Amino acid sequence: MSSFSYEPYFSTSYKRRYVETPRVHISSVRSGYSTARSAYSSYSAPVSSSLSVRRSYSSSSGSLMPSLENLDLSQVAAISNDLKSIRTQEKAQLQDLNDRFASFIERVHELEQQNKVLEAELLVLRQKHSEPSRFRALYEQEIRDLRLAAEDATNEKQALQGEREGLEETLRNLQARYEEEVLSREDAEGRLMEARKGADEAALARAELEKRIDSLMDEIAFLKKVHEEEIAELQAQIQYAQISVEMDVSSKPDLSAALKDIRAQYEKLAAKNMQNAEEWFKSRFTVLTESAAKNTDAVRAAKDEVSESRRLLKAKTLEIEACRGMNEALEKQLQELEDKQNADISAMQDTINKLENELRSTKSEMARYLKEYQDLLNVKMALDIEIAAYRKLLEGEETRLSFTSVGSITSGYSQSSQVFGRSAYSGLQSSSYLMSARAFPAYYTSHVQEEQSEVEETIEATKAEEAKDEPPSEGEAEEEEKEKEEGEEEEGAEEEEAAKDESEDAKEEEGGEGEEEDTKESEEEEKKEESAGEEQAAKKKD
C-alpha cells in the first residue's frame, strides 16, 4: 500500500511557520512538486502546486483503480483506518488553520481600525495643511499692513527730512545774516573807534583851545594891565605936561589940544584893538563850540548805533540759539523715529522668519506623517496579500480533498469521503473562507493602489507648494530628480511583477479549465454558500 502526504499542497514558508505535524510520504507523488515561492512575493504558488497535485493525483488514481478492486476487506479496513487517522490529523490541522485564519481576520479588523485612525490623522493633517494657508493669508495681510506702516513712516521721515532741510536753509540764512551783522558790527565798532578817536582829538583840541583861551584871557588881562599902566603913565605924563604947560603957559598955549588929540588917538586904537581881540576870541570860541557840538553829535550817534547793534546782535544770538535748540530737538526726534522704525522692522522680520520656520516645520511634519501613512499602507497591502495567499492555500486544500473524495471508487470509501467533505469541512466553506482568491487580492490591491495614489498626490501637492514658497536649491533639485527616477523604476518593477502575475494567472486559468469542468457542481454550491456568507457578513457589518 502506497503512502501519501500533504506536503506538496503547502508552500515552504507556510510549512515552516504553521505546519509542524509529522509527514506521511507518498513516493509516487513527491516527484511532481517543487518548493513554492514566499507568500509575500507572490500568492500564485499554492494554486499552481495544487493544480500539479491534481494532475499527479488524477494520474495516480488511474493506476490505483485496479489495485483497489483486488483489495480484500482487511486491506479496505486498514486503508479506512489510515484514512480516518489522516483525516483526524487533517481536521486538527484545519482547525489550527481556522484558528490562525480567525486571528488573521482579527488582525485585518485591527488593521482596518488602524487604517481608519490613520485616515482620521490624514484628515487632521489635511486640515492642518489647509490651516497654514489660512495663517499664511493672515500673516501676509499683517505683513502688508506692516509694510504700509513702514511706508507711512518712510514718508513721514521724508517729510521730516524736508522740514529739516528747510530749517537748515533757514539756519544758513540766519547764519549769513549773523555774519553780515557781525561784519556790520565790526564796521560800526571801527567807526565808533574812529568817532571815539575823533572825540578824543576834539577833546584835546578843545582843551588846547581852552588853554589858549585862558592864555589869551591872561594876555588880554595883561594887555589891559599894560594898557592901564600906559594910560596911567600917559595920564602922569599928561599931568606932568599940564604942570609943565601951566608953568609954560605963556610959551606953549596949544599943548593941551595936542594931548587931547593924542589921547583920543590912543583911546581909539585901544578900543579898536579891544574890539578886534573880542571878535577874534568870539569867532574862535564859536568855531570851537561848533566843532565840539559836531563831535558830541557824532559820539552820540555812534553810541546809539553801537547800542542798536548790540541789541540786534543779542536778538539774533537768541534767535540762533532757539533755531539750534529746535534743530537739535528735531534731530533727536528723527533719530528716535529711525531707531523705533528699525526696531519695529527687525521685530517684524523676526516674526516673519519665525512664521516661515513654523510653516516649513509643519510641512515637513506633514510630509513625514504622509510617508508613515504610505509605509503603513504598504504593510497593510503585504498583510492582505499574505492573507489572500493563505486563503488560496485553504481553497487548494479543499479542492484537493474534493478531488480525493471523487477519486475513491469504493462505495464505503466514497460515502465516507462524501460525508467528510460535506459535513466535517462545511464550516470552512463559508463566505469568509471561500472568497475568490483571485478577486480578493485584486480588490485590496486596487484599493491600496488608490490610497497610495491619493497619498502620492497629496505629497506631490505639498512638495509643489513648498517649491512655490521656496526656490529649491541645486542639491534639492538633484534629490527630487533621483526620487522621481527611483519612483519610475519602482513603478516599472511593479508593472512587470503585475504583468508576470497576470501571465501566471492566465496560465493557471488555461491549465485549470479542464479540471474546472469536473468541479462545476461543487463550484456552484460554493458560490451559493459564498453568497449566503456574504449576506451574513453584510448583516454583521450593518
Swiss-Prot record:
Residue ranges, annotated region (Linker 1): 126-138
Segments for region (Linker 12): 235-253
Listed Basic and acidic residues bias regions: 460-471, 528-542
Region (Linker 2): 273-281
Positions bearing Phosphotyrosine: Y43
Pfam families to which the protein is assigned, alphabetical: Filament (PF00038), Filament_head (PF04732)
GO cellular component terms attached to this protein's record: axon; axon cytoplasm; cholinergic synapse; cytoplasm; cytosol; growth cone; intermediate filament; neurofilament
PTM comment: O-glycosylated; contains three N-acetylglucosamine side chains.
Keyword check for Cytoplasm: yes
Domain IF rod: 90-401
Region feature (Coil 2A): 254-272
Region (Tail, subdomain B (acidic)), start-end ranges: 445-542
Ranges annotated as biased composition (Acidic residues): 472-527
Region (Coil 2B): 282-397
Highest taxon above the source species: Eukaryota
Chain positions found as Asymmetric dimethylarginine: R23
Location of this chain's protein in the cell: Cell projection, Axon; Cytoplasm, Cytoskeleton
Record region (Head): 2-93
N-acetylserine, modified sites: S2
GO molecular function list: identical protein binding; phospholipase binding; protein domain specific binding; protein-containing complex binding; protein-macromolecule adaptor activity; structural constituent of cytoskeleton; structural constituent of postsynaptic intermediate filament cytoskeleton; tubulin binding
Modification Phosphoserine, positions: S56, S67, S103, S453, S473, S503, S522, S531
Other comment: NF-L is the most abundant of the three neurofilament proteins and, like the other nonepithelial intermediate filament proteins, it can form homomeric 10-nm filaments.
Function: Neurofilaments usually contain three intermediate filament proteins: NEFL, NEFM, and NEFH which are involved in the maintenance of neuronal caliber. May additionally cooperate with the neuronal intermediate filament proteins PRPH and INA to form neuronal filamentous networks.
Name used for this protein in its record: Neurofilament light polypeptide
